[in-house]
């Protein structure tokens, strides 16, 4: 049994962490923080938790928090995390940061895309928390950088191809669609019902989305070379889910069954990656509420391109579920503990 605290429990990621951890047999949630809802029951803020938790949201100092828990989920905005993580690490605590503050290896790249980094010395200590690629490192780390939602779907979709060296890395085009929870719970005009309902739009077009360097960093490691991709995110009028359609030029002649074998071999022991039968395509409704990533592909022999499709729930495998999966690895628990959830359909 481990005592955990959720810093920033009033956002979508925070409530999803609470939902998942309420079902975890090895976890005791000892604190949930929220400045906005301090003194309010978490189940009052999120009625879906009624009868499952009696926790009260609190506005605690780091010193007070360190007396409560051994492992911390930092579900706070960028810049905020880098201000609190060093204090938690200095107290000997384990930290899973769900912001982007420790995902990028280079402080210069982070500052180009986000803002000044005030804890640069910790970047080299952080492990990128994609279990399918970094399980051994995750098991040993004190500071884990939980991946972004779009990067998770794209990296898992492309990893077998890049490892096998059968595509031209610089040809990759990632076309991703996300539900509105990806924009967070804060009030924004672009997230209002009338702005989103019955519509579908691209945003962050032309190398403007902050997940771009994260995707390139990890794909570059898989390919053993630095390169740039074209990444265009879109906003869907649904609550949760990401579908990434990723295109790349093949650099050799290869049959679909050979590519299928590459995917099946890489992910055969992965509990949360489901490689679909040849000819099948993933869909967001079949991973909803779960920690699964469903992957399918097709080859266009006329153009010499492969089209990979990857579906995840952006709030689960794209955020809170992956964080719990990482916690399990860091703490030596069974990796599926608390996450063996059948996707919600319809």
Swiss-Prot record:
InterPro entries: AGPR_AS, AGPR_type-1, NAD(P)-bd_dom_sf, NAGSA_dehydrogenase, Semialdehyde_DH_NAD-bd. It comes from the Bacteria. Keywords: Amino-acid biosynthesis, Arginine biosynthesis, Cytoplasm, NADP, Oxidoreductase. It catalyses: N-acetyl-L-glutamate 5-semialdehyde + phosphate + NADP(+) = N-acetyl-L-glutamyl 5-phosphate + NADPH + H(+). Its EC number is 1.2.1.38. PANTHER family: N-ACETYL-GAMMA-GLUTAMYL-PHOSPHATE REDUCTASE, CHLOROPLASTIC-RELATED, N-ACETYL-GAMMA-GLUTAMYL-PHOSPHATE REDUCTASE, CHLOROPLASTIC-RELATED-RELATED. This is N-acetyl-gamma-glutamyl-phosphate reductase. It comes from Desulfotalea psychrophila (strain LSv54 / DSM 12343).
